């Protein structure tokens, strides 16, 4: 069972906030009253006794201490920026296994934590954006891919690995063989909308499926990995519980945010590597 960290964070903030509120309206007045009664009953109040009477319950003390920290984390993570780690090579060469990235949570609208309901419109995904989203077949799993098809687009990917959007071939330019692959993989520069980025194709690997064509419904997006022959993306998703016309599509409510930067890398296996900052930079 996957850990629902946003839900746990909201619960932690709520519990700590409740403890702080209870102290404000109930425990603190009782402490002040006890101190006043004690001071009125003796001619020379003992500072040690006053300190003991004014001591907060341990649970309240922890709650009040953690509340501001957890609240700030909740606001930052839910509405501004959230960190993620790249678990696979499906976005090579743009992102590699072990990259730690930052995701802008407000680029595509302000959403409430846990329920992910959009409450403030800000903007929509654009073709070429690198986007984190919840996998349609298992919303507890986050995926990261590049936005290829927008609502209303017709996307076609051919058996010879060419991409077409609305009948027009997407521009790409061969950059050369990928280093350390003995020529088995090539890198291309592709332009999606206003975004120029690199993609990877394996020359020795043939697609197991024929030409595919998809019509992107309203409120949905078609996603592909930059590592075109090693990416579980909109081209391949299949789920009997999802209507046929929505197979491969990411609904707007599943959007997490826009990936915009790599801030650290820690290659696998982590026990034999150290974190490094060689790949730090903005994501194209």
UniProtKB/Swiss-Prot annotation:
Cytoplasmic side: 23-58
Alphabetical UniProt keywords: Cell inner membrane, Cell membrane, Hydrolase, Membrane, Protease, Transmembrane, Transmembrane helix
Chief localisation class: membrane
Record-level Gene Ontology MF annotations: serine-type endopeptidase activity
Membrane topology of the entry: Multi-pass membrane protein
Cellular component GO terms held in the UniProt record: plasma membrane
Name of the featured protein: Signal peptidase I
Organism of this sequence: Pseudomonas fluorescens
